[in-house]
A protein has these predicted regions:
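C-terminal terminal-subdomain/extension
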Residues: 61-193
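Residue-level detector of flexible, active-site-proximal loop/helix-junction positions
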Residues: 13, 54, 101
Length: 193
């Protein structure tokens, strides 16, 4: 995964959000914008749902534009931008994600769609940081349960990093484990379980 790239999320991830008590109602394989990698946790990214403006009414678009001008947290909920066409970034519907839950790159005109406009990226990142700050003050405030989802993904990452050698199940590791247990017995040390 790369920052500022667009991806499709897996059904497994949508199911995970629901299992954790959150809501994610869009199963249409719309692209999500992979905005930034977490500053503290490697391989954890912050993604933002996107949608096409074509099916929005002029009244809905005007309402979103008005919200964008507000100084309150509502001003960070959405961003109207442009990639290969006008797009709505639903920033308040952001979520953490890992590579495990990406089903593929979002392809447009035969290539992986990547946002390259630095001004757009800056505005989106600022709004994302506002939403994440608000979430830190009010955990699970947003319908997708950002905090709970992040905690779950962090625990998955930690488990992957600390997989005991016994879990790797290869012939080489079986021999290594047997030798380790023999050495521990000779030294009178009880092997860890």
């Amino acid at each position: 995964m790369i920052e500022n790239g667009f991806y499709k999320i897996s059904e497994e991830f949508i199911d995970l959000i629901h299992q954790l008590g959150g809501k994610y109602s869009d199963r249409k394989e719309r692209p999500v914008f992979c905005c930034i990698e977490d500053s503290k946790i490697k391989n954890l990214y912050w993604a933002i749902q996107t949608s096409d403006l074509a099916h929005r009414t002029p009244a809905q678009i005007e309402k979103i534009k008005l919200w964008n001008e507000e100084k309150s947290i509502r001003g960070a909920y959405y961003h109207i931008g442009y990639t290969n066409r006008p797009a709505l970034y639903r920033i308040s519907n952001c979520f953490p994600i890992t590579r495990k839950y990406i089903s593929g790159e979002y392809i447009s005109q035969g290539i992986h769609l990547i946002l390259k406009n630095p001004k757009e990226i800056e505005v989106i990142q600022k709004k994302l940081h506002r939403i994440l700050f608000d979430e830190s003050l009010h955990p699970n405030k947003y319908e997708q349960h950002i905090t709970q989802l992040r905690e779950y993904l962090v625990s998955e990452i930690e488990c992957q990093r600390s997989v005991p050698i016994e879990m790797l199940k290869t012939p080489f590791n079986d021999v290594l484990i047997q030798k380790s247990q023999t050495i521990h017995r000779k030294k009178g040390i009880e092997p860890e379980r």
